[in-house]
Amino acid sequence: MSKGILGKKVGMTQIFTENGELIPVTVIEATPNTVLQVKSVETDGYEATQVGFDTLREVLTNKPAKGHAAKANTTPKRFVREFKGLEGAEVGAEITVDTFAAGDVVDVTGTSKGKGFQGPIKRHGQSRGPMAHGSRYHRRPGSMGPVAANKVPKGKKLAGRMGNKRVTVQNLVIAQVLPEKNVILVKGNVPGAKKSLIVVKSAIKAK
């Protein structure tokens, strides 16, 4: 059965195993999520579980959102996402961090940090030219295609806005789960800035 939860990135720290090994981990705070709706093929055309996270102040919401949340006996949520494969979920039920356990393999999704307008070296990892004073080619994009075409081919890797994209890191391992603090510790780093929304779900390519 697939598992999933919404949370916020707190930052990074490190923990030590019993044999003294140091492990860098990302701290994800996931307060209890509320199941807002269970979608079915008969009524919605597909199966999914709609989950809400982070209570939204009443002044910032509207009547449709209030009515939708009231069906689950809860308050409107700041973040609403859908998961597929969450079997047995009922409207109004809560999903907590203890649905996961240490050693679980998960996929983590977030929005990467925006880097602004960047050149091809930083954005695509292109090699730079010689830096000697006789060279006129240092950090330019280089050839953009053949002469005869008289145009730049689609998909050419050039300078542009970098980051601020939805990124999923697959097959990360959960190091620890702290139910009393609503915290999940994931080995390694995950995309996104501090306080940004993080989606943790069972890995689809786990070995």
Curated annotation (Swiss-Prot):
Record's family? Belongs to the universal ribosomal protein uL3 family.
Q: What GO MF annotations does this protein's record show?
A: rRNA binding; structural constituent of ribosome
Gene3D superfamilies xref list: 3.30.160.810, Translation factors
Q: Does the keyword rRNA-binding apply?
A: yes
Describe the task this protein carries out. One of the primary rRNA binding proteins, it binds directly near the 3'-end of the 23S rRNA, where it nucleates assembly of the 50S subunit.
Looking at the UniProt entry, the stretches that span the membrane are none
- What InterPro entries does UniProt report for this protein, alphabetically? Ribosomal_uL3, Ribosomal_uL3_bac/org-type, Ribosomal_uL3_CS, Transl_B-barrel_sf
| Pfam families in alphabetical order | Ribosomal_L3
Name the GO terms of the biological process aspect: translation
**Keyword terms of this UniProt record:** Ribonucleoprotein, Ribosomal protein, RNA-binding, rRNA-binding
What HAMAP family does this protein map onto? Ribosomal_uL3_B
Tell me what this protein is called. Large ribosomal subunit protein uL3
Keyword Metal-binding attached: no
* Organism for this UniProt entry: Lactococcus lactis subsp. lactis (strain IL1403)
Annotated Gene Ontology cellular components are: cytosolic large ribosomal subunit
